[in-house]
């Protein structure tokens, strides 16, 4: 009989498509969760202040139209609610900000990174970084509502793959998470958000 072990599988099928990579971290850096044609994936979002000469907002990362609109909504929402979240209300009045979603050669689209982008922008304004293994997904509206997204199973698996054990999901996706098999749900602490205030409270203790 032919015996096939881990080494043989790799020899036949090549290296794994997904590798276990440590999530990025730092001020203005937040880990989101995305669904792709190959399954779930973590989606880091970076925000940085380029200069303070004038107000401005730049997007990069090969983003589709829907994702660009999500970024603009996140920027408008956070910029108009900074004081409520404990940041300088005028921070974005004199800040040229660059928002980037890494792996620039990979096309990205959809609304589910809205809360992630908003959190990266708030992290930048507050000069506060996320120091624990936390990831999030959810569509954000201009008034701060958090709407449901698809691919919850794949996104949860993606979080587990990189060692993340805290998740922020839209409250409307609660049933989707609860329906997952126990072996997928096990070990996660999940926070459900109806509004962006719920997200900020988990991440920064604000709102």
Task: Please state what every model-predicted region is.
Residues 4-9, 15-31, 38-207:
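Peripheral, non-AAA+ core regions of ATP-driven protein-machinery
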